[in-house]
């Protein structure tokens, strides 16, 4: 199993995805490779969480009810800038351009390999 560069046990990674099985599997994987995680079923749950101010990086889905990932990204950029990685089923270029244009570190498609994910996290945490 790969490990993150300069394994950072202090980094808190937020996973915001309405797909319960995906967010739990991703949370388990990240904990196995040395990250602390906090998982949320919605953007609102994330923003209302007491853990929110301590998050080092957010992994977001694009398609979520009520507030989607792009809306959450805009909110974070305006109020609490942290590195953002999108992991999504969406494969359209316009959405990718919007996310990256607004500052996302990476825009990855599900399923994502562990190696690709670790590379994105290393980039995000060194940004």
Q: Where do the protein language model's features map onto the residues?
A:
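A Lys-centered signature of the CheY-like receiver
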Residues: 110
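Receiver (REC) domain active-site loop signature in two-component systems and cognate sites
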Residues: 64
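Non-catalytic signal-transmission and effector/linker regions of two-component phosphorelay proteins
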Residues: 1-14, 20-22, 27, 115-127
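Active-site residues of response regulator receiver
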Residues: 61, 88
């Amino acid at each position: 199993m790969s490990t993150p560069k300069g394994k950072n046990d202090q980094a808190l990674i937020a996973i915001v995805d309405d797909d319960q099985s995906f967010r739990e599997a991703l949370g388990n994987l990240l904990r196995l490779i040395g990250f602390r995680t906090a998982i949320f079923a919605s953007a609102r749950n994330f923003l209302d969480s007491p853990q929110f101010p301590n998050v080092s990086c957010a992994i977001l889905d694009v398609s979520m009810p009520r507030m989607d990932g792009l809306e959450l990204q805009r909110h974070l950029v305006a109020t609490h800038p942290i590195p953002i990685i999108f992991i999504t089923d969406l494969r359209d270029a316009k959405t990718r351009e919007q996310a990256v244009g607004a500052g996302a570190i990476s825009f990855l498609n599900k399923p994502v390999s562990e190696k690709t994910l670790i590379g994105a996290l290393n980039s995000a945490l060194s940004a």
